[in-house]
């Protein structure tokens, strides 16, 4: 589902499909954060030296983690929060992105539908008279299952559809096709870094209105200027998860594939180039049929001097994108995670985003606003031991492997480790955070305790998600037995989405400076894991083999 903030920072646009047709909703939504109930209520806040706006306040039953009553502070625009929150020393959830806030408050589930996807790529001239001009654009539409190739050539007088004699007409045709086809998702390889910024930059240079590509007339970095537009991100590009094109999802397929590859524990890829990934997956890469032996010469001269090879090169790049995604289900895996989180698409990549969305939905308290950490607080991490000091080096026969299933999540459950379950009194759920990181004898203790009377948010979330993942795995097995390949893929993606979400939980408590971060929780989790590994190792040493 598409969840985009509008240019006025007051409305949210959501879009989905019913029977293949796009449906949308435009909804006003007030941006807000929280302060403690006894804090002073300022009447206005300053946006800049010319503009000030009134605050609105709302009383409710909101509480902080420590049980302090809170009240809501409402501002006019989402971008106002950054300055408005500085009027108080302590705020709560003042760092939640506007789209995240809307999804948490307004959405309970996301509709399941087939997204219309465009896989696309561009080539632009390197050197010469037409340096930096876009020469070819290729797109594949997964609804009509067609490849489209736009190109232009100086003095072109042919009649081939989508071929032009100038760059401007070619780009205008591409944009009009985007408007007509109305794709939900644009998928490219490093497209947010290179292709989309280049397209927007050339639009502005040629006097083309790039805003037409956005159903809600919002593109980050693009501003109206006189009779045209300017673009401020031509050099830097966008971040890999950014959603700059309001009303459409943009996906860097390289990022989605890399995450999936790493999840499968197949090792680190030495290169994320499309050529290397394609060779690794399929044993074949980009088209290299050209009269130029030097690739740089091909990029510089191929457009006009080896046109057929140049056009094929551009087409094959998009064919590879389609093949990578349709054989590995990279984009659908992220869509499955989005439906699980009930969140904007950009929330589905980093642990801090995934975890915070989930916890804000399920906590019965309001989290403090994150703050910059000048110096990280150190704590002991995972086990590290030296085979020489442990006398385990050498040849071993009759070796058995032992592994914990979900070690860190299991420790959260076993010790009831959570923000609200900390105990100042000793309990059965004690964690010795001084547990050694090797198999040496413990020489000191430093105990942290957790309550036993009520299951905490963190272990409760793990247990609920484990049950959900097991259910998805069961449905996947049923689909496999029924020979329904599409359902197998669907439930595999869903169970992997749950796995990724659970894996984010440790990362979020260890991410210092973030609102949900807590060093004591992180230290308790890693210490409990070390204790479990040490106990297993000591038991193994007692065995006679």
List each language-model region with its residue ranges.
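Common nucleic-acid-contacting/processivity interface regions adjacent to the catalytic cores
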Residues: 295-416, 484-531, 539
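Beta-sheet entry/capping signal
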Residues: 115-117, 136, 184-187, 192-193, ...
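Active-site-proximal helix-loop-helix substrate-binding element of RNase H-like nuclease domains
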Residues: 147-149, 157-165, 182, 186, ...
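Structured alpha-helical segments in the cores of large, soluble enzyme domains
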Residues: 166-178, 274, 278-291, 494-506, ...
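DnaQ-like (DEDDh/DEDDy) 3′-5′ exonuclease domain used for proofreading
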Residues: 1-182, 204, 316, 320-339, ...
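Residues immediately flanking
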Residues: 120-124, 253, 402-404
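Proline-aspartate-enriched helix->loop->beta-strand connector
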Residues: 174-199
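Conserved catalytic core of nucleic-acid polymerases
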Residues: 97-99, 404-407, 413, 417-418, ...
